[in-house]
Amino acid sequence: MIQSIAFFFDAGIILYLFGLKEKKKMRATLFVVLLYKCLMMTTGARQEKVAYLIVLLYLYFFVCNTVTVGKIAMVVAGCVAGFIFISAIGTVRTGSSSGIKDVLELMQSGQMSNIFGSALGEFGSAFDTLEVAVKYTPAYITYGYGTSYLAGLISIIPLVVKQIPFLDKATIFVHQLPGGVYFALGGSYLGELYYNFSWLGLIGSAIIGKFMGKLNLGIVLSKQHNALYGAWCAIISTAMIMFVRGYFTDMMQKLVWTYFIISLIYAYLKRRST
């Protein structure tokens, strides 16, 4: 539930960005959030911050502003700097030190090599969980038959899933395996689909891809039609990007509660204006 409450901040920034008309305020908001997220990344977890910044930068450069060659060049330069920064954080985390000072010192030292290779290597690790799912299901653990997604829906109510053993073990299915197998494994929506539906999970992948396309369309058309709907599509997109390396239960609670709060505020403001 704490993660759900923290997600309200991220959702609020996206809503605020969509509501801004002044370019200076947009730039100031982007700078402050970018600085804050980068500082938070140096303390450890990077995935959620990176996923959020991807959506936020996309909104700022390609939705809220007119696309120009200069802005594209700026995005490319920012991506290169981001690769270096994230790789430096990963290198620092493997040692005994941590923090923004150590990360900046490493970046300035010139000791980092094969930065892009290391960054691309992170994508390969996403298949580890899928490989484990294919290898051990159903040989070691039985198919979930959709229990992971049922658990995700029920997880909207805090602490309930923990009281139902067969749902609890399905939330992170790899925890049913010996510790030596799942140690340091991240999540994977592909692995979760296979665990639940075997190769029929391919159909689920197509559905998720179609859904992501709908979200992007909602964001792109939001400025001409419905800014609130576009903001909500962007909020869901941050969770969906994390879903690639996560589990269904990771996003359901925070998305539903965020939608509930936004709906309450919207209803209150609408009633107040009439």
What is each stretch, according to the model?
Residues 7-17, 33-39, 163-169, 188-194, ...:
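Short juxtamembrane and helix-loop transition motifs at transmembrane-helix boundaries
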Residues 26-27, 68, 146, 165-168, ...:
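A diffuse structural propensity rather than consistent per-protein peaks
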